[in-house]
């Protein structure tokens, strides 16, 4: 479905274009952006649309939203979107099946992907993790939540075969746990906070607790990136500026997050919204280039994260052979931003 911020972006673009000549209006180039609603890493898309930053770089965004990463990446086959954000697990799957590129990192969501237990069972599982053996865990397959859960199981000396895994969407997991039909669930924020606040569930292990790096990915269709590299660079510059602004104006950022989450059907406390900021590091332009740097032909930090994710997916039977990180992760477009004085200055603005 079309994202709720599409109308905002269109309206802002119209106003900005309308202030100049008709020729200026014609210079706005459509770019199709995909994301998942009411998620921390998607907030910059909303903020940038509200602030009119896409139009400042000559872009007119058209947004589409998806409930999870797998249907999102599948939609790329029909070219329904050009660029976007998603989890690192679907980004890797998208590289194999749909020739998608990972062009940057949205955030470190290692803490935000976790295994939760219902209020009545959590303490028992925490005291004796081995008791999870034989239990049923509901989670969204081929997701960052799935990766975090299996990393937690490994931390406790358990394997996927030691539990029964049932795959379902995040809304279904919340419903199942809230109604007492499931005791253990793999969720990602802000759904984790919804379960804690509305149903008294407890987070018993996160990807971070298990030592698993769980990044979010900025992605692009390879064919689009080849045809429109400058638009991809502009997309990145807008996204990076939005994070700069969000981190520098947290009170206003929290207010905008509240509205954005509510549009996606999520209502959480201000304390939980603040926790999103404190537990999920983001990267500015310099930070992105640092973690994606392949100095002397070696692997980057991001390569290492995705190599482990690929191994997890291969072990799951998602594909027979994991893709080499260097084949689908590229800093080419971030370097374009860095090399362009205008884009670099834009990306680094916090106002």
Question: Residue locations for each model-derived region?
Answer:
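Secondary-structure end/capping motifs
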Residues: 227-320
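Soluble non-cytosolic domains of exported or imported proteins
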Residues: 66-70, 85, 139, 143-144, ...
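Pocket-lining segment of extracytoplasmic ligand-binding domains
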Residues: 121, 172-270
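Short linear loop/turn motifs
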Residues: 62, 271-283, 324-338
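Conserved C-terminal helix/tail region of periplasmic/extracytoplasmic solute-binding proteins
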Residues: 303-351
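Short, glycine-/small- and polar/acidic-enriched structural segments
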Residues: 26-169, 176, 183-189, 204-205, ...
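C-terminal segment of classical bacterial N-terminal signal peptides
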Residues: 8, 13-23
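Positively charged n-region of N-terminal signal peptides that target proteins for export
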Residues: 1-4
């Amino acid at each position: 479905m079309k994202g709720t911020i599409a109308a905002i972006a269109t309206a802002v673009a119209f106003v900005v274009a309308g202030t100049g000549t008709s020729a200026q209006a014609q210079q706005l180039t459509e770019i199709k952006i995909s994301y998942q609603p009411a998620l921390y890493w998607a907030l910059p898309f909303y903020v940038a649309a509200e602030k009119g930053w896409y139009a400042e770089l000559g872009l007119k965004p058209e947004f589409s939203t998806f409930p999870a990463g797998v249907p999102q990446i599948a939609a790329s086959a029909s070219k329904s979107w050009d660029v976007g954000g998603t989890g690192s697990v679907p980004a890797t799957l998208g590289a194999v099946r749909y020739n998608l590129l990972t062009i940057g990192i949205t955030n470190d969501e290692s803490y935000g992907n976790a295994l939760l237990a219902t209020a009545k069972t959590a303490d028992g599982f925490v005291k004796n993790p081995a008791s999870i053996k034989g239990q049923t865990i509901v989670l969204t397959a081929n997701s960052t939540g799935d990766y975090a859960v299996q990393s937690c199981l490994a931390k406790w000396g358990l394997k996927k075969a030691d539990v029964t895994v049932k795959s379902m969407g995040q809304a279904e997991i919340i419903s199942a746990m809230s109604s007492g039909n499931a005791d253990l669930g793999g969720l990602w924020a802000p759904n984790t906070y919804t379960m804690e606040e509305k149903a008294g569930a407890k987070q018993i292990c996160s990807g971070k607790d298990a030592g698993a790096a769980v990044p979010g990915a900025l992605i692009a269709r390879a064919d689009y990136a080849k045809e429109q590299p400058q638009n991809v660079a502009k997309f990145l510059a807008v996204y990076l500026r939005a994070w700069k602004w969000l981190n520098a104006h947290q009170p206003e950022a929290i207010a905008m997050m509240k509205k954005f989450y509510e549009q996606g059907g999520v209502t959480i406390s201000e304390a939980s919204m603040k926790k999103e900021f404190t537990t999920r590091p983001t990267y500015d332009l310099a930070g992105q280039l640092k973690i994606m740097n392949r100095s002397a032909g070696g692997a980057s930090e991001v390569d290492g994260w995705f190599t482990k994710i690929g191994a997890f997916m291969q072990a799951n039977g998602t594909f027979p052979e994991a893709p080499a990180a260097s084949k689908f992760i590229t800093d080419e477009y971030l370097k374009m931003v860095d090399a362009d004085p205008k884009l670099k200055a834009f990306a680094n603005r916090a106002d």
